[in-house]
Amino acid sequence: MSVVEGARVDAGAGEVPARLDGRLRLVLVVLLVAQFMLAVDFSILNVALPVIGDGLGFSLSNLQWIATSFALCAAGFTLLFGRVADLFGRRRLFLVGLAVLGLSSLVGGLATSPEMLIAARVFQGLATAAGTPARLSPLPTSFPDRPSRQKALGLIGALMSAGFTTGAILGGVLTDLLSWRWAFFINVPVALAVLFIAPTVIKESRPATRPKLDVPGATAVTLGLLALIYGLTQAGEHGWGAPSALGWLAAGVVLLIVFYAIESKSSAPLVPVSVLKKKTVAWGNIAGLVAFLTETSLVFLMTLYLQEVLDFSPLTAGLSFGVLGVGTVIGGSIAPRVIGAVGTRSTLIVGGVLQAVATLSLVALGETSASMWLLLVATFAGGVGNMLVIVGFMVTATTGLPDHEQGMATGLATMTQQIGITMGTPIMSAVAAANTDIHAGITTAVIVNTAIVVVGILTTVLFLRTKAAKDVAAAG
């Protein structure tokens, strides 16, 4: 049955969501812990960057590479590793990714030079790219019935967004109370625990027919994404008109066009063009891109507001996002029931509208702490709405595909998440920096953020329609 149009999300008529038995709950806990840990790594160092720069001797111009080196690898290599998971085993790649993440986190915490730290961040990004699609693609075999899989997708989606928010909080707490090095060290025991438990509870899975690795396509899409994301970081640092930004963005677009052309002719494409043409895949991923781009960049804007306008400490600013984290967890927890009641398309629309209204209300923030009540209420409501969209996107973009394409589909969905996280901050930073008054710049960026959410709603309303629902039903 359809998961897009107003149909209920059931495996059969009248079916209610399945209860998870003890083993499935343990599998889900392992996947959730890994998801949360990888999501935290996207933002945990943000508030600690000045302290790290002073401690290791980073120049101001090179400080951005602590975040950029991680984001480039995490987003740029995700699709490639999604297919590698199909080739060599999803559980195997999941475990390898976790091991590399734990080791690189240890190296990062022990870093004594900028080069050593950047190398650790590169391997953290690669581990994230390897671990994320490999972690999500076992869902069809671990949770073969649709209701239990939707529960898992809802919780995993919630943890992705909540982990990003928690990273901002945790980074401030660890840096303020202990040392920035603990932002790295905290990954090590978690990775070891998951590595100890995962082999006993997660089944190995790979397609029945071993697919070939599309080397030209993999090269084109990886280089294209790297160029595109690097161009966005250059735009955030130097402005949208900077030659370096325009050059890298143009190169990224050209390479992605080349990738599409390669996939159209390949006998064993990395991403079958027929899959990309499915409305559920295409527009579901567009909705996810908008959700992650806007909410994570809003955290950046509100961090800027709290520290630069209200003069809060990094610790206080980080703790202020606790209500946003609660909102995302609640939104992710109720999303499967909302989808079951009204369908994925309506859930995407309702969540988007709630997020847009909550975000737009932030234009009323003043220059005193009296505005904190508005920030807390708006970020909570926006977090709930954002998670409805994220879970709706995950269900839409990964449902109705055969098992041998699950690694690719989850790789696409994960790449969408990570590109959204990577794109958001440079875009909003460039918008905010265009105004010499920091408060006015933040207000303008909030309006732009809201407009992007509205565009996401409109694409869902206009393009994710009945035909897409039939496509999913036919494929499922």
Task: Tell what function each PLM region has.
Residues 24-40, 45-49, 60, 126, ...:
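12-transmembrane solute porter fold
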Residues 55, 142, 204, 234, ...:
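Generic structural signal for alpha-helix termini and adjacent loop/cap motifs
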Residues 154, 176-289, 294, 312-313, ...:
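Hydrophobic transmembrane-helix bundles of small-molecule transporters
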Residues 3, 475-476:
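Short, intrinsically disordered, low-complexity terminal/loop segments
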